[in-house]
Curated annotation (Swiss-Prot):
Component of the PAN1 actin cytoskeleton-regulatory complex. It is found in: Cell membrane; Endosome membrane; Cytoplasm, Cytoskeleton, Actin patch. Belongs to the SLA1 family. Residues 2-69, 70-127, 393-455 form the SH3 domain. This is Actin cytoskeleton-regulatory complex protein sla1. Residues 217-226, 753-776, 1140-1150 have a biased composition (Polar residues). Keywords: Actin-binding, Cell membrane, Cytoplasm, Cytoskeleton, Endocytosis, Endosome, Membrane, Repeat, SH3 domain. It is a peripheral membrane protein.
Length: 1150
């Protein structure tokens, strides 16, 4: 359907949102959609002359009104719309005309629909023609001689008064076409041109002369006059110098490829151009030229003039702004064709591809007829043929010496080494007309750039053109080029020439994807180049051409064999195309031909059936040559001249008989048929062939089993194996007959039997004639019990684990025969020197000592745990055992004997803590000293045995801890007394040295002296750590201070109390030794040398801290009814939280 309505804008509207359309008062709008929900309609605005686009958007429906029709029209023919914007109608239909601004497409309405219709399909009413005639924008047209041109001059100043200056020349073609149609209907068939478009000769201007040759003396182009405008060649100055010309440069104006004369000062208007071309001989046609603007095809009013007498073609746009007029001679037209209302022309020098829209098919036919007469007269085929025959000379062939870049429309680009044909070298000595052989382009180039290579022989004197006239040769050549161009056009989807669609009306709703004029020109040139390149392809040698056929016998081609490369056969076809065909696709005959030509064997690429047939045929030929009659069979008639078509073997039935799945039978059958296999190859089929054909492994076993059974094949090579190895009669998983083995049964291996290991020397005796008597000495093997015979066949498992077997004691109960070996024969005794030389003496053997078997100690089982053990643990005493007293007196190094320390004694009253390790033995490396080192204190490492500590009845763990601490204090006092006694016996007193740098604090009962050399030490307090038993902290013991014996100066101060030093490790390890400076202080305090230092107080000696028991193990049981300290209370577990009774103090509600 077309438009829903044609409306005109009543008010101006500026868009307020996206998607809306700007309209002004008086704009013509085409309504596309009418909304039923709101007052916004979708419309398209008619494009003005300045704005070629037709925007689409939303407009308010109260800003527009329906446009009134401007006239009526009657349909001359039936028409069916081609696009959505067009309108269909029938013959004699009455149409309402709304817009006639486009000369070819009229906006009309018919039966409530609106759209565009072709102008030549309708006839406007008299009112419409009368209304359009006096329009002020009517452009000038060629008129009879009685109407002077000067009378139209006053119309020029009136054109600015028009509200639409750009539409001034638009209505003229429509009015002219309407007049032409009216005259054709009222009168007889029209003449060559309508009277309106055939102006008479002007009295002021002479007839248009023919195109003169370029004069040598002319250097520049003078200011053109009316009588000389059509004679301009625009290139004389360039013909005599390779440099840029002094004349104006002819520039191309995209996209219409029109020349511009702004540099020449040409300001002549359209009227002057028309007046210059009006004189007799010219047939004028007011048509439209299809040009491309912004990617769209538009129609540009143009005047086409054809002068058959002078052989001139004139093209002049209606408006001067579209470009000046251009002229070509007849020989510059290389192509013309007709397609409906379109006329296509190809012109050179300057090159231009033109698409004219004649408006009517009759007009287009008339134009093409005139162009045909013009081309025939320009070619003068008969006259040229007579002249060529009389002169006996042809065109010259030349080669380009230098690169030349065209600087004008009549020149052509050439490169060094290009081959050219010299068309004209007579008109000018410095500029020659040539045709480039590479792309068939013609133009002028400097003659100094070309070197003549010789003459070109005429094509009509030899070859297929011999005896044909030039006209017939040209006709054949044109027909061939037309066919090639048509093929290329179909291939490249280029709609040029026959079959081209009519150009549709340019619209924003209908996008066109055709190329522009320059693109069409390039495509046409490429078509010509491709046609020439195809014709210039090399052809194969006819003597070596043969027919090649593929393996399926479906395709064949005549070509020449070139080479065999990369598994492909290179062929040269008759049309010059070179192809490469895989070897596997060629027939056997072709492969044999290639083998004969190259000497390379191609048996791997041949079908297996053909190879078998060839082998059998060769064997039959050998048999026949030897006089033996060939065996009857399919190969007996291989050498016969006539072949008998035998029916194909039914492979489908064959695979069915092999128990192959029905769905796979057809696929396997096709594979065998593709390989051209028949029943003759069945005896030779093996697993490898089947795998190559794509048969599955399971089906391969079935097929091989069927063939073995059918042809009674017993060879190992017929069996199917895995990994390419033959298994002989039986395979790994199948038996001799092809049946699958049951490998799930596995028997018990036979037991090893021990034989006699005594070598019988009689077996090596030389008496070979004597045979051992059957009564021999019984061997242990003979006396061994014979195992029970097993059944050959068993049902179920072959394992005999359930069989009754003799006990092993029976076999070992008969060793007498084995312990009595046979008496060895006595060897002759060799004495004397013979014994020394003899090799028969037995070598000496060392006597091996029998190792004594040591009885391994039997591991004693740990005693059973009974309640009495736990009862006895509570009576044990805790504490550290007393160290062993050392021998008194000084111990010299000579008295340091290697002694093993005595193991600790375990008594019934020992503590729960494991006994401490013994003191370090004196055999260990010691410092060499004349005095005995202090005894090493035993250090307990690790933790005690994991035994629960159970308090006896009536006591708690707190009581036990207090008793333990008292025992430890007593033991510590005993150790200190022992140390004092040892020091007195040794004759030396230990002197504490060094400073305590870890604890600078001083106890309250210590009196500091001025020259104290060591800081007192605090008492060592063991670390108090928390235990899971919630034991109260143990009270630190208070050791008795040692009485230090000062040396040197006698001090009147009482000795300081010694305090143990904490080390920060744990209570089990002694503190680390600190380096202590010794010696006297020199006079560092600044006093004179006779200063007597005060006495040095004794240095306290650090003693090892006693060990404290650490409670380990599980918590002790809770005993009720015992008074004393608070014992550990059992903690209830496993209860469930009761949130209903939860309080801040008891959040879980227990």
């Amino acid at each position: 359907m077309g438009f829903l309505g044609v409306y005109s804008a009543v008010y101006d509207y500026v868009p307020a949102g996206e998607g809306e359309l700007t309209i002004k008062e008086g704009d013509i709008l085409y309504v596309l959609e009418k909304s039923t929900e709101d007052d916004w309609w979708k419309a398209k605005k008619k494009a003005s002359a300045e704005d070629e686009d037709e925007p689409v958007g939303l407009i308010p429906n109260n800003y527009i009104q329906e446009a009134a029709p401007s006239g009526k029209a009657r349909a001359l023919y039936d028409y069916t719309r081609q696009t959505d914007e067009e309108l269909s109608f029938t013959e004699d239909a009455q149409l309402e005309v709304f817009d006639t601004s486009d000369p070819d497409w009229i906006l009309v309405g018919f039966e409530g629909e609106y759209g565009f219709v072709p102008a030549n399909y309708i006839e406007l009413s008299e009112e419409e023609q009368h209304k359009e005639a006096p329009a002020p924008s009517l452009p000038s047209r060629p008129r009879p001689a009685s109407v002077p041109v000067e009378e139209e001059a006053p119309a020029a100043p009136q054109s600015p008064l028009s509200p639409q200056p750009a539409e001034t020349p638009v209505a003229t073609p429509a009015a002219a076409i309407a007049g032409i149609l009216k005259q054709r209907q009222a009168s007889a068939p029209a003449a060559r041109a309508p009277p309106e478009f055939t102006p008479e000769a002007s009295d002021e201007e002479p007839p248009t002369p023919t195109l003169p040759a370029r004069p040598v003396s002319q250097v520049s182009v003078p200011q053109p006059t009316r009588g000389q405008e059509h004679d301009r060649e625009r290139e004389p100055a360039r013909r005599y110098s390779p440099r840029l010309p002094a004349s104006p440069v002819v520039t191309a104006s995209p996209p219409h490829n029109r020349v511009s004369f702004s540099t020449m000062g040409v300001v002549n208007d359209v009227d002057e151009h028309k007046a210059a071309r009006a004189p007799g001989g010219f047939h004028m046609y007011n048509i439209s030229e299809m040009v491309h603007v912004m990617g769209k095809k538009k129609k540009m009013p143009t005047t086409l003039g054809i002068n058959i007498a002078t052989g001139t073609i004139l093209i002049a746009p209606e408006q001067a702004r579209d470009g000046p007029e251009q002229t070509w001679t007849a020989e510059k037209m290389t192509h013309y064709s007709l397609e409906g209302k379109h006329v296509f022309m190809e012109l050179v020098r300057p090159s231009k591809s033109i698409d004219f829209h004649a408006g009517a098919k009759d007009t287009a036919t008339e134009i093409v007829s005139a162009l045909g007469e013009l081309a025939g007269a320009a070619r003068a085929e008969g006259l040229r043929e007579v002249i060529a025959a009389g002169s006996g000379s042809g065109q010259k062939r030349g080669q380009v010496l230098y690169d030349f870049v065209a600087q004008g429309d009549d020149e052509v680009d050439v490169n060094v080494g290009d081959e050219v044909v010299i068309i004209d070298d007579v008109k000018s000595e410095e500029w020659w007309m040539v045709r480039r052989v590479k792309n068939a382009k013609e133009g002028v180039v400097p003659s100094s750039y070309i070197e003549i290579m010789g003459a070109i022989q005429s094509a009509s004197s030899a070859g297929i053109n011999a005896g044909r006239s030039t006209v017939e040769q040209n006709r054949l050549e044109e027909a061939r080029l037309a066919r090639e161009a048509l093929k290329t056009a179909k291939k490249d989807e280029v709609e040029v020439g026959p079959g081209m669609r009519l150009p549709e009306r340019g619209s924003s709703l209908f996008a066109r994807d055709n190329g522009n004029q320059s693109g069409e020109q390039k495509r046409r040139e490429s078509v010509r180049e491709s046609g020439q390149s195809r014709s210039s392809k090399s052809k194969p040698d006819p003597a070596k051409v043969r027919t090649w056929t593929d393996r399926s016998k479906s395709f064949s081609v005549e070509a020449q064999f070139l080479a065999l490369k990369d598994g492909k056969i290179n062929l040269h076809k008759m049309n010059g195309v070179k192809i490469a065909v895989p070897v596997v696709k060629m027939s056997v005959e072709d492969l044999e031909y290639v083998e004969r030509m190259t000497g390379i064997s191609l048996d791997e690429d041949k079908p297996l059936s053909d190879i078998k047939k060839q082998q059998k045929s060769r064997a039959a030929e050998r048999d026949s040559s030897n006089g033996a009659s060939p065996a009857p069979g399919p190969s007996a008639s291989m050498g016969a001249g006539a072949s008998i078509q035998t029916p194909e073997y039914d492979w489908f039935q064959f695979f069915l008989s092999c128990d192959v799945n029905v769905g796979l039978c057809e696929r396997y059958a096709q594979a065998f048929k593709r390989d051209s296999m028949d029943e003759s190859v069945l005896p030779d089929i093996d697993a490898t062939v089947l795998r190559n054909l794509g048969i599955r492994e399971g089906d391969i076993i079935k097929i091989i089993r069927f063939l073995d059974k059918k042809y009674m094949r017993k060879d190992g090579k017929r069996n199917v194996s895995f990994g390419g190895e033959d298994e002989g009669e039986a395979g790994l998983f199948s038996g001799p007959g092809g049946a699958l083995k049951n490998n799930t049964r596995k028997g018990r291996p036979a037991p090893a039997v021990q034989t006699n290991d005594v070598v019988d020397a009689n077996a090596f005796s030389q008496n070979g004639t004597e045979k051992s008597s059957p009564q021999g000495v019984a061997t242990p093997l003979a006396n061994a019990p014979t195992p029970a015979e097993k059944d050959v066949k068993r049902e179920g498992f072959d394992d005999d684990a359930w069989d009754v077997k003799p006990s092993k004691q029976e076999t070992t109960s008969s060793p007498p025969a084995q312990s009595i070996p046979a008496a060895a024969p006595q060897q002759p005794v060799i004495t004397g020197s013979m014994q020394e030389l003899s090799l028969l003496s037995t070598p000496l053997e060392p006597v091996k000592a029998q190792p004594t078997a040591q009885a391994s100690p039997q591991p004693q089982a740990p005693p059973a745990v009974t309640p009495s053990i736990f009862a006895g643990i509570g009576n044990q005493q805790t504490g550290v055992p007393q160290p062993q007293p050392l021998p008194s007196g000084p111990l010299l190094p000579a008295n340091l004997a290697r002694q093993r320390p005595a193991p600790p004694q375990m008594t019934a009253n020992s503590t729960l803590i494991p006994p401490l390790p013994p003191s370090r033995p004196l055999s260990a490396p010691q410092a060499a000293s004349a005095y005995a080192p202090p005894p090493l204190q035993a250090q307990a490492t690790g933790y005690g045995a994991f035994q629960p500590q159970i308090a006896p009845p009536g006591q708690s763990l707190h009581d036990l801890n207090q008793q333990r601490m008292q025992q430890q204090q007593q033991q510590q006092m005993q150790q200190q007394q022992f140390m004092l006694q040892q020091q007195q016996q040794a004759g030396m007193m230990q002197q504490p040295t060094g400073f305590n740098q870890f604890n600078p604090g001083v106890p309250n009962n210590f009196q500091q002296f001025p020259m104290q050399t060591g800081n007192p030490q605090q008492p060592f307090i063991p670390n108090q750590t928390g235990t899971p038993f919630a034991n109260p902290p143990a009270q630190p013991f208070q050791p008795q201070p040692l009485q230090a014996q000062p040396t040197g100066f006698q001090s009147a101060f009482p000795p300081g109390q010694q305090y143990p030093q904490p080390t920060g490790v744990n209570s089990y390890l002694p503190p680390a030794l600190q380096p202590q400076p010794t010696g006297m202080m020199n006079g560092a305090n600044g006093f004179n040398q006779n200063f007597t230092p005060p006495p040095i107080p004794p240095m306290p000696q650090q003693q090892p801290a006693p060990m404290l028991p650490q409670a380990t193990g599980p918590a002790p049981p809770v005993r009720f009814g015992v008074n004393g300290t608070n014992n550990i209370a059992p903690q209830p577990t496993g209860r469930r939280a009761n949130l209903a009774q939860a309080t801040p103090q008891n959040p879980f509600g227990f």
